[in-house]
Design a protein with these regions (language model features):
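Alpha-helical transmembrane segments and their immediate juxtamembrane cytosolic regions
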Residues: 1-348
């Protein structure tokens, strides 16, 4: 989740000026193109790991315990954490950045907290499925999920563009609850399968891993120039959009699995640094997005080079994000709002 800070800081300097705050002085295709590959797999990797961890919890705890944990760790941060940090951004923006309160809609409230909506929806699906079902799932359900995540995803985009024409808050809710869910559930599903088939991870040959890596890189090489608008690899018709979606699923899914495979075999669970990074992740993820926007505006000086501006923005975003975490974890009401576990008392 932490690599998102690098991506959002780079998005401020994007030549496409599509981010919430786009610098009028600093535009760098070279920098944006350097960071862009991580954008193609980071959320897919996140949901793959989330599916694995969800099934691990369900295998050890009852469904009631699992659901209560999801309400505390996912729904509460969505309702309170997102509301809090994005409200502060709105206040800051209304004073300094010409934000209008009339535009403080559902998207402004949730913004980058959309992944929490996906997690709570996926947790709801887990609650509906029998416990341990992923240990018994065959090929057909896997194909069905893959088809929904590819053909279904493209169909939803096509129907909305051609028939539904959803706009405003309705479009935002549609994207957050349905479109993103269909987009990322195949990876959550794959992570859930991995939990019950961990024995197969030990039998994967080095040759298979190399082939998967090569396949993922080839797919990435097709997506990369198209996403950066360097060369139109795929057409804008429905067949081109579907092909692009399939290639992206191959690229992001392969890289997500390879990352999972690597860290699965690196046993560092006892490291204090790793525990700290895990415990702070939700706070860093929720606060860095508005911080990038505010700091991007505050630091935007034409006297700085693109590299200086980016590095300053990146470093200060990390510093203030972790300062926020240190403050949040020390205040009970803020710990609750961000879904953190209670602090353990220190014994002398």
């Amino acid at each position: 989740m932490l690599i998102g800070v690098f991506w959002h800081a780079a998005a401020v300097l994007s030549p496409f000026a599509a981010f919430v705050y786009a610098s009028p002085y600093h535009r760098s295709m070279a920098l944006y193109a350097t960071i862009y590959p991580e954008h193609l797999f980071r959320m897919e990797a996140f949901f793959l790991v989330s599916g694995f961890l969800s099934q691990m919890t369900l295998a050890r705890k009852t469904k009631a315990v699992f659901w209560r944990a999801r309400l505390k760790r996912v729904l509460v941060p969505l309702l309170l954490g997102c509301l809090g940090v994005n409200f502060l951004l709105q206040v800051f923006g209304s004073i300094f950045m010409e934000y209008r309160w009339a535009h403080y809609d559902v998207w402004r409230w949730v913004m980058h907290g959309w992944f929490l909506i996906c997690l709570i929806v996926f947790a709801g699906i887990d609650m509906l499925l029998p416990r341990g079902v992923f240990a018994r799932i065959g090929v057909l359900p896997c194909l069905l999920v893959a088809i929904i995540g590819s053909v279904g995803y493209v169909a939803l985009i096509f129907w909305n563009n051609e028939s539904w024409h959803l706009g405003g808050d309705l479009s935002t809710l549609y994207n957050f609850f349905i479109l993103h869910g269909v987009q990322y559930y195949p990876f959550y599903f794959a992570g859930s399968l991995l939990y019950y088939h961990q024995d197969k991870l030990a039998r994967i040959s080095r040759r298979s891993l190399i082939l998967l890596g090569a396949q993922s890189l080839i797919a990435m090489a097709l997506i990369y120039p198209h996403g950066l608008e360097l060369y139109p690899i795929f057409n804008n018709n429905i067949d081109g959009i579907l092909t692009q979606r399939l290639v992206l699923m191959v690229a992001s899914g392969g890289i997500a699995f390879l990352l999972f495979y690597y860290f699965y075999h690196v046993q560092r669970e006892g490291s204090r640094t790793v525990r700290y990074l895990i415990n702070s992740a939700i706070v860093i993820y929720l606060v860095h997005h508005p911080l990038v926007i505010m700091l991007g505006w505050l630091l935007d000086d034409p006297a700085l080079s693109n590299t200086q501006y980016y590095l300053l923005l990146l470093i200060l975003t990390f510093i203030f994000s972790y300062l926020c975490y240190e403050g949040v974890r020390r205040v009970a009401i803020l710990r609750f709002a961000f879904g953190l576990k209670p602090q353990q008392p220190r014994h002398a």
